Amino acid sequence: MAKLSLINREEKRARLVKKYAAKRAELKAVIANVQTSDEDRAAAYKALQELPRNASPVRQRNRCQLTGRPRGVFSKFGLARGKLREYAMRGEIPGIVKASW
C-alpha cells in the first residue's frame, strides 16, 4: 500500500488539472492560432507558465484505486496487476477469464 500522503498528492493534482483545464486549453489555443499577434502569443506563454505546475496533466500518475501502487496499473480497470489478477481469479471483473488454449 502506498503512503497516504502520495495518494492525497495525486488527488490534489487531479483537482488542479480539472480546475485549470479550461484556462490551459484557452491559452494553448491562443498560442497555436497563427493569426495571433506576437505580443498576444507572448502574453499567453507567460500566463501559461504562471499557472501552477501541478495543473499540467502530464504530472499526473496513474495509480491503483485500491492500493495506490504507481506502477503496473492497467488503466482500463484502474487496478494494479496484482489486484487485477486477484479480482479476475475470483470472477469479480465481468468478461475476464483465465486464458486457456
UniProtKB/Swiss-Prot annotation:
Q: Which GO terms describe its biological process?
A: translation
Keyword terms, alphabetized:
Ribonucleoprotein, Ribosomal protein, RNA-binding, rRNA-binding
Q: Name one GO molecular function term.
A: structural constituent of ribosome
Q: Name one Pfam family in it.
A: Ribosomal_S14
Q: Which InterPro entries match?
A: Ribosomal_uS14, Ribosomal_uS14_bac/plastid
Matches recorded under SUPFAM superfamilies: Glucocorticoid receptor-like (DNA-binding domain) (SSF57716)
Gene Ontology cellular-component terms listed: cytoplasm; small ribosomal subunit
Q: Which domain of life is it from?
A: Bacteria
Tell me which HAMAP family the record gives.
Ribosomal_uS14_1
Q: Please report which protein family the annotation says this sequence is part of.
A: Belongs to the universal ribosomal protein uS14 family.
Matching entries from NCBIfam families are given as: PRK08881.1 (NF006477)
Subunit annotation? Part of the 30S ribosomal subunit. Contacts proteins S3 and S10.
What role does it play? Binds 16S rRNA, required for the assembly of 30S particles and may also be responsible for determining the conformation of the 16S rRNA at the A site.
Q: What is this protein's name?
A: Small ribosomal subunit protein uS14
Its lineage opens with: Bacteria, Pseudomonadati, Pseudomonadota, Betaproteobacteria, Nitrosomonadales
The gene it comes from is rpsN
